[in-house]
């Protein structure tokens, strides 16, 4: 067991609760101690929801430990069924229920006798899966449950929709810009003449899940959520899926061409090449921007990218292919799917890092000293400590990355948003310099030490004065190089002589 003050992916029950609370009229009951029920507050705050989060905690307390949980859990399920009249109640296991070895499946069977709606136990092992894996499994489980139920009752609709149609799978609550991406993907499908059959799980009714096989294909924009469901629908209903994330000009075009291929294989003749060219040349500003002098100023600049598989891979490709930025390190915290990530990014970056240890990532950033970081909320904190600008491109995120305005990452409008984010993340060198020359609020000394270790070196007055003469936008680098040189040579104090020797050593 490892004590962590920062987790990139939360525990399994958070993933299950994200899926349950994304659906319409589905209630989740969490069998957990006080403290595990922070999901309600987190979702209400971050998503700015007007409605209460449909999650109830069945608290494990001393009475439960003494007498067992069955009576309490069953009563809570039946009570909520009567009060809320949900279509489905999902009972969510937690690490506590696993430790207590509660027979939750038996509780569900018992509660189903008295409940009017459906009751389902989320089939996730709390010690084997994290938030993302649990969300993927829970969505698959709910879809499978309702499709099999409809099949038994012979209520499955026969045949496909008259016009080409799509299911968009994987849009959920607390996802990174998910609502904006969903709107952009719907607009993209409309432009292509494709009807949206269902969007799951966000805002979907479980009663409509039986309509999923009517679509011509499934679109899975995020690798972390929805892939298992899409694979199940392909196996059971011969429903093809597209799992190319339409992020960036190149990948959006590739995604549209794949959709074209799938639709044409089903007896229709569509050609989207003119649409792709028109969007790339005239609608999306990203292709034009990448040829402008502004973007050429970024050519060869060093960047570090870190996030979930989908976003980290997509941003790495955009930076390297479309903007000419040098990605020194690309990393992901999705260790369970590391092979896919390596395959996607290895040709676009110097180094690949697969880790969920924020200290390791922080140290790598301090070592590389990139011009900009593209990562999660944690990398933003690291960037602030090292005075390196950071653009947030993946969850986990805080409130400022749940924007009120329209900011998709997918589709052609997404390419514009990403181009803005990238350009605005790089510090323009003269900005710091001018602030120091003419005075301003931003004259703080650059924090230049590594993330994990405090500096053990002293600077004498002359050396400190000389350092302060160095322009702000390179001062951090000069300080780090000098301290590195001093440590290697065994100096405990940095004087002017040491500083000049360090300068000669690095050939500056």
Swiss-Prot record:
Family to which the UniProt record says this protein belongs: Belongs to the ChlB/BchB/BchZ family.
GO molecular function, a single term: 4 iron, 4 sulfur cluster binding
Alphabetized Pfam families for the sequence: Oxidored_nitro (PF00148), PCP_red (PF08369)
EC number: 1.3.7.7
Top-level taxon of the source organism: Bacteria
Keyword Iron attributed: yes
Designated name of the protein: Light-independent protochlorophyllide reductase subunit B
GO biological process, any: light-independent chlorophyll biosynthetic process
Alphabetized InterPro entries for the sequence: ChlB/BchB/BchZ, LI-POR_suB-like_C, Nase/OxRdtase_comp1, P-CP_red_C, Protochl_reductB, Protochlorophyllide_Rdtase
Pathway it works in: Porphyrin-containing compound metabolism; chlorophyll biosynthesis (light-independent)
NCBIfam families: DPOR_BchB
Presence of the UniProt keyword Flavoprotein in the record: no
CDD domains: Pchlide_reductase_B
Record's function text: Component of the dark-operative protochlorophyllide reductase (DPOR) that uses Mg-ATP and reduced ferredoxin to reduce ring D of protochlorophyllide (Pchlide) to form chlorophyllide a (Chlide). This reaction is light-independent. The NB-protein (ChlN-ChlB) is the catalytic component of the complex.
Enzyme type, top EC level: oxidoreductase
Cofactors (names): [4Fe-4S] cluster
S-S bonds: none
Cofactor note: Binds 1 [4Fe-4S] cluster per heterodimer. The cluster is bound at the heterodimer interface by residues from both subunits.
Binding site for substrate: 429-430
Active site as annotated: 294
Reaction catalysis annotation: chlorophyllide a + oxidized 2[4Fe-4S]-[ferredoxin] + 2 ADP + 2 phosphate = protochlorophyllide a + reduced 2[4Fe-4S]-[ferredoxin] + 2 ATP + 2 H2O
Assembly behavior: Protochlorophyllide reductase is composed of three subunits; ChlL, ChlN and ChlB. Forms a heterotetramer of two ChlB and two ChlN subunits.
Keywords: 4Fe-4S, ATP-binding, Chlorophyll biosynthesis, Iron, Iron-sulfur, Metal-binding, Nucleotide-binding, Oxidoreductase, Photosynthesis
Binding site residues for [4Fe-4S] cluster: 36
């Amino acid at each position: 067991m490892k004590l962590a003050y920062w987790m990139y992916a939360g525990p399994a029950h958070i993933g299950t609760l994200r899926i349950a609370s994304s659906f319409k009229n589905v209630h989740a009951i969490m069998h957990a101690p006080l403290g595990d029920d922070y999901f309600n507050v987190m979702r209400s705050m971050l998503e700015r929801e007007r409605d209460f989060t449909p999650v109830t905690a069945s608290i494990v307390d001393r009475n439960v430990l003494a007498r067992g949980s069955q009576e309490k859990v069953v009563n809570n399920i039946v009570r909520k069924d009567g009060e809320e009249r949900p279509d489905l109640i999902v009972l969510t296991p937690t690490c506590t229920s696993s430790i207590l070895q509660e027979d939750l499946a038996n509780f569900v069977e018992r509660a189903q006798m008295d409940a009017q709606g459906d009751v389902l136990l989320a089939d996730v092992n709390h010690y084997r899966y994290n938030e993302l894996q649990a969300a993927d499994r829970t969505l698959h489980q709910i879809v499978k449950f309702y499709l099999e139920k409809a099949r038994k009752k012979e209520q499955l609709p026969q045949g496909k929709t008259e016009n080409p149609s799509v299911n968009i799978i994987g849009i959920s609550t607390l996802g990174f810009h998910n609502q904006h991406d969903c709107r952009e993907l719907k607009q993209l499908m409309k432009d292509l003449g494709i009807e949206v059959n269902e969007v799951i799980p966000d805002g979907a009714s479980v009663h409509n899940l039986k309509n999923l096989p009517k679509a011509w294909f499934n679109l899975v924009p995020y690798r972390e959520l929805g892939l298992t469901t899409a694979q199940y629908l392909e196996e059971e209903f011969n429903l093809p899926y597209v799992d190319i994330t339409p992020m960036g000009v190149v990948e959006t075009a590739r995604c549209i061409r794949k959709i074209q291929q799938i639709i044409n294989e089903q007896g229709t003749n569509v050609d989207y090449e003119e649409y792709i060219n028109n969007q790339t040349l005239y609608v999306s500003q990203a292709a034009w921007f990448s040829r402008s002098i502004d973007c050429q100023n970024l050519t060869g600049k060093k960047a570090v990218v870190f996030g979930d598989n989908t976003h980290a891979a997509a941003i790495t490709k955009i930076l390297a292919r479309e903007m000419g930025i040098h990605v020194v390190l690309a990393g992901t915290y999705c260790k369970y799917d590391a092979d896919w990530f390596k395959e996607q990014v290895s040709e676009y970056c110097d180094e690949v890092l697969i880790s969920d240890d924020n200290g390791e990532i922080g140290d790598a950033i301090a070592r590389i000293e990139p011009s900009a970081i593209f990562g999660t909320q944690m990398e933003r904190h690291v960037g602030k400590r090292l005075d390196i600008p950071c653009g947030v491109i993946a969850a986990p995120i805080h409130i400022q990355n749940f924007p009120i305005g329209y900011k998709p990452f997918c589709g052609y409008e997404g390419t514009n948003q990403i181009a803005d984010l990238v350009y605005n993340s790089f510090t323009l060198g003269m900005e710091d310099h001018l602030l120091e020359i003419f005075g301003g609020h931003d004259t703080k000394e650059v924090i230049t030490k590594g993330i994990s270790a405090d500096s053990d070196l002293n600077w004498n007055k002359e050396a400190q004065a000389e350092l302060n003469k160095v322009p702000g936008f390179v001062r951090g680098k000069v300080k780090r190089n000098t301290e590195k040189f001093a440590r290697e040579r065994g100096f405990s104090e940095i004087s002017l002589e040491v500083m000049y020797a360090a300068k000669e050593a690095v050939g500056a």
